[in-house]
Curated annotation (Swiss-Prot):
Subunit structure: Heterotetramer consisting of two non-identical subunits: a beta subunit (TrpG) and a large alpha subunit (TrpE).
Gene Ontology BP, a term: L-tryptophan biosynthetic process
Family to which the UniProt record says this protein belongs: Belongs to the anthranilate synthase component I family.
Cofactor binding notes: Binds 1 Mg(2+) ion per subunit.
Span of the signal peptide: none
Cofactor: Mg(2+)
Keyword check for Lyase: yes
Catalytic class of the enzyme: lyase
Protein's name in the database: Anthranilate synthase component 1
Pathways involved: Amino-acid biosynthesis; L-tryptophan biosynthesis; L-tryptophan from chorismate: step 1/5
EC number: 4.1.3.27
GO molecular function: anthranilate synthase activity; metal ion binding
Binding locations of chorismate: 327-328, 448, 468, 482-484
Length: 514
């Protein structure tokens, strides 16, 4: 680290433990934007810490080759003042009201993979911030960036058809945490951690007082999540079953011609959702998943319960991990909705022995191996889990895990840039599949199929694919789901699969407003 790097001061305070992170989030954040809740389902696992961004120092968003930096406090403003002194002349800087806009050079998309990967890009906005400050105590979350990479971010790096979007979702949207709350369910502890990026004594006093205020609030009885009832919840879609089935059949013809091997078309479902946090609480209870998230932005709210990791990276071991999911069946239930264990096991057996499902799954495992081959040390890739079954409230999936060791000179953001978007949401070959998806879906995907999670200044990254999720704008929900199409797919089954995948979120929203 350069001697000129600015030190980060960490302020920590223990607070009363509460077992329900959703209630805590509601109590502390209410409807404030630039707040985030990230959690996992299994409290027995070591990694089952719930992390909340209570206050953000800065909002960092991107569209095309521009990055917008919006300071949200004096603490965040200090970061901008420091950045302006060190920014490369290759990056243009503009000031618009309280925002600072960084314009990066367009990436030459016909470059080879490595040259493209090392080209100056919008990801360098994060690298600049990280390199400017020094984490002397090596605290794991001194600089904690939490937020969303949208599916459409790929258009910065690859040539894809230009599409219109009817949502305000940026290519990426992240918050640099000023105050974090970390719940540890094993130890039953609650830690308030604040990061100070300035030597301003008044700002330090404000942040210390804010920590005391949060602790005092957690000593109080937690506010209940408000309820909003809706008499009639009308579910609509941008494609009916026939239209979606027709797209599947057209794509199958391209598979038969050999243009692609597999592709994942999707459709959107719409329904009112004036109370997203209540719907999220219902979704957690009905469909607990490895990754659960609730993000409140100035433009949207995003929540979900995702079964699938996008990309995970541990800087200490330099191990990078992908978790392809492909192969889906509904859970075995009786007519009254109760789980039938015998039927459930027979459905699992049928899925495990289905040639189409196995072919599709192994194709995506191979695609994950290829993704890692570009960025990992030769000979370091391996499949640690192959074709096992994960179960959720409405569906079960075939899953595998692929691991490799990241090459020297690359970081977690290089890895994400190389691997996006995940093959289980695109197809194979990946770029060709994404081009066809754009051609047939005809609009931006936004958050769907991108990734949500966090990365830190120490280099660690943990994200999940944004599926089984609800994107809410102006009290209205966009719930998107797709199906993996191969040569011998049955269109009617794939149409039903897309609805089965969307059902958990749809039911949660309905139950929250009943």
């Amino acid at each position: 680290m350069k001697k000129s790097a600015y030190p980060i001061e960490i302020i920590q305070k223990q607070a009363p433990y509460h077992p329900d992170p959703t209630m805590i989030f509601n109590h502390l954040c209410e409807s404030r934007s630039e707040t985030l809740l990230l959690e996992t389902a299994d409290n027995k696992k070591k990694r089952s810490r719930k992390i909340m961004i209570i206050d953000s120092a800065m909002r960092i968003s991107s569209e095309h080759n521009a990055v917008k930096l919006t300071p949200l406090s004096i603490n965040g403003m200090e970061i901008l003042l420091v950045l302006k002194k060190i920014i490369s002349k290759k990056i243009e800087i503009y000031r618009r009201k309280k925002n600072t806009i960084l314009i990066f050079p367009n990436i030459e998309k016909d470059l080879d993979e490595d040259k493209k990967l090392f080209s100056l890009s919008v990801f360098d906005a994060f690298r600049l911030i990280i390199k400017t400050f020094e984490n002397r105590e090596k605290k794991s979350k001194a600089m904690f960036f939490g937020g969303l990479f949208s599916y459409d971010l790929i258009s910065v790096f690859e040539t894809l058809p230009k599409l219109k979007g009817n949502q305000k979702c940026s290519n990426f949207c992240f918050y640099l945490a000023e105050t974090l709350l970390v719940l540890d369910h094993q130890q039953k502890t609650c830690l308030i951690q604040s990061s100070l990026f300035t030597k301003n004594s008044n700002e330090k006093k404000r942040i210390e007082e804010r920590s005391v205020e949060i602790k005092q609030k957690l000593n109080q009885k937690l506010n209940s999540i408000p309820k909003i009832k809706i008499k009639d919840i009308n579910l609509t879609s941008n494609m009916n079953n026939f239209e979606y089935g027709s797209i599947i059949k057209k794509l199958q013809k391209l598979i038969q011609k050999g243009e692609i091997f597999q592709v994942v078309p999707s459709r959107k479902f719409y329904l009112p959702c004036p109370n997203p946090l209540s719907a999220y609480q219902k979704l957690k209870k009905s469909n607990p998943s490895p990754y659960m998230f609730f993000m409140q932005d100035q433009d949207f709210t995003l929540f979900g319960a995702s079964p699938e990791s996008s990309l995970k990276y541990d800087e200490k071991t330099r191990k990078i991990e992908l978790y392809p999911i492909a192969g889906t069946r509904p859970r075995g239930r009786t007519k009254d909705g109760n789980l039938d264990l015998d039927l459930d096991s027979r459905i699992e057996l049928e899925m495990r022995t289905n040639h189409k499902e196995l072919a599709e799954h192994l194709m995506l495992v191979d695609l994950a191996r290829n993704d890692l081959a570009r960025i990992c040390k030769p000979g370091s890739r391996y499949v640690s889990d192959l074709v096992r079954v994960d179960r959720y409230s409405h569906v079960m999936h075939l899953v595998s895990r692929v691991i490799g060791e990241l090459r020297e000179g690359l970081d977690a953001l290089h890895a994400y840039a190389s691997c996006m978007n995940m093959g289980t949401l695109t197809g194979a070959p990946k770029v060709c599949a994404m081009q066809l998806i754009a051609e047939y879906e005809k609009e931006k995907r936004g958050s769907y199929g991108g990734a949500i999670g966090y990365f830190t200044d120490l280099g660690n990254l943990d994200t999940c694919i944004t599926i089984r999720s609800a994107y809410v704008e102006k009290r209205y929900c966009y719930n998107q789901a797709g199906a993996g199409i191969v040569y011998n797919s049955i269109p009617e089954d794939e149409v039903n699969e897309s609805l089965n995948k969307a059902q958990a979120v749809i039911n949660a929203i309905k139950n929250a407003h009943y």
